Amino acid sequence: LNLLTVICSRNPTKDLIDCLEGIKQFYPDADIAIIDSDSDATEVYRSVDVPVHYLKNKNYELGAWKLAYELYGDYDAYLCIQDTLIPQNRLPVETLCCDQVMSYFNITGFKYDDLADLAIELTEDTIYHDVVSKHRISEDFRLATHNSFLIPNGKLSYLINALPNLPVDKRGSMAYERILGLAITQSVGSVIRMNHSFNKRHGSRQ
């Protein structure tokens, strides 16, 4: 399986170095690329030995995955992760089939109407507009949040084309985590949770 690991990073810290070390340990044959999402602090990139590409707007994860596919569109599969996900063991990438996604996700929701409204706005003119609107229940817009996943080429291409309205700030990124969760679960045959293979580090990054 020809695998590319894409790491989305913003204002990177030592977490990025630890993430890279884990990828190299558990996926030694995979290629790696970092997509930066308009960082103010980039000093950590001087310590890495993989390509770093700069996306000069705050499109966060989905923008990173889209740019990576534009630059590296010929891989069999893509491990798309945030730089705060530290690998703990190897995913069975060889068993990934064309109608399957392995995803790091949690079940959570919005507590404010404006974030739910933003999710609906971001899906305007897409095939997911009606279903996102339907999932909005009172003040609690509850969906699985997917922002990191192992995905076959064809499914990543589909998501990028099906969700063209990219987020431009952190609030938009929060909304898009829910939108991606909905799009992934509705577009593949099965979703396998990969949380056990990563340690999520939480910080105060903006």
Language-model segments: residues:
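ER/Golgi luminal nucleotide-sugar-dependent glycosyltransferases, focusing on the catalytic module
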Residues: 1-206
